[in-house]
């Protein structure tokens, strides 16, 4: 069925202008919604992760919020976040500190722990097997990690910056499905790539027709979601729109 999309959205977090109060956001980037409709948001310029219950006017700071810095109680331009249900913790990509950190969601938590450092991380995803997938936008690759593993396994890109099917150029956000297929917003190639498990190269599944605003094009894609039918939803940044690509569509 072709769902009818309402043209007017409903504000569920922020909306009170740019700022650092708990009813405000300042450059929100990645977000994650859990099974209870609780939302955690990487509030990038506020150097914090803020949690929002559906219907609340104010959020609650659950990581960072102690200014910009590299102490374990601070964050530095967090760009993506997810919830690890198994350990009831937040996993956060900190762009400014080039590290991935974990913060417990238990009350009383005042600092995080470093999982991986020296990584130009942007996007995070966790598969059903609790593997952590991280994009590195300087190495132009995506790696898969077991929690506690520092090196990981290459799963997409890793052949330098470029537009070949075995390359990426500034990979940002990720989505991983139940088959461990990795979808990547390949930002500067203006396309979304799909890498099947174990593949040596990816498949272009959205965009890839150069920078532009035609319906066949994307311009610096960011946020990404893939539903169970393989339909791709992507935030088309420079075109200021959200695009839906059905499986097999050109």
Task: Please state what every model-predicted region is.
Residues 47-50, 98-101, 140-143, 152, ...:
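Structural signal for beta-propeller blades
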Residues 36, 44, 54, 86, ...:
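Short loop/turn segments immediately following the C-termini of beta-strands
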Residues 33-36, 83-87, 126-129, 176-179, ...:
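Residue-level detector of Asp-centered blade-edge/turn motifs that repeat once per structural unit
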Residues 97-132:
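Asp-box/WD-like beta-propeller blade repeats and closely related beta-sheet repeat scaffolds
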Residues 39-40, 89-91, 131-134, 182-183, ...:
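Conserved beta-propeller blade signature
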Residues 1-27, 56-79, 107-120, 148-172, ...:
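Gly/Pro-rich loop segments of beta-rich domains
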Residues 215-249:
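Loop/turn-rich, solvent-exposed surfaces of beta-rich toroidal or solenoidal domains
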Residues 15-47:
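Beta-strand-rich domains and repeat architectures in extracellular enzymes and scaffolds
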């Amino acid at each position: 069925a072709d769902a009818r999309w309402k043209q007017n959205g409903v504000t569920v977090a922020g909306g009170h202008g740019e700022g650092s109060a708990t009813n405000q956001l300042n450059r929100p980037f990645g977000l994650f919604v859990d099974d209870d409709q609780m939302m955690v948001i990487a509030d990038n310029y506020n150097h914090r992760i803020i949690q929002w219950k559906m219907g609340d006017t104010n959020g609650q700071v659950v990581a960072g919020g102690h200014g910009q810095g590299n102490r374990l109680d601070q964050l530095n331009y967090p760009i993506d976040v997810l919830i690890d249900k198994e350990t009831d913790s937040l996993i956060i990509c900190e762009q400014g500190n080039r590290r991935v950190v974990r913060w417990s969601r238990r009350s009383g938590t005042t600092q995080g722990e470093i999982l991986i450092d020296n990584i130009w991380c942007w996007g995070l995803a966790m598969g059903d097997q609790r593997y952590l997938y991280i994009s590195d936008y300087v190495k132009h690759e995506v790696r898969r990690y077991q929690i506690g593993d520092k090196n990981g396994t290459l799963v997409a890109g890793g052949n330098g910056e470029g537009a070949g099917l075995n390359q990426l150029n500034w990979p940002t956000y990720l989505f991983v499905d139940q088959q461990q297929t990795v979808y990547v917003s390949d930002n500067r190639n203006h396309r979304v790539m799909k890498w099947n498990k174990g593949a040596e190269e990816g498949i272009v599944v959205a965009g890839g027709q150069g920078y532009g605003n035609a319906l066949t094009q994307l311009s610096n894609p960011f946020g990404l979601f893939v539903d169970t039918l393989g339909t791709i939803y992507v935030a088309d940044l420079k075109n200021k729109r959200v695009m839906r690509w059905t499986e097999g569509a050109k």
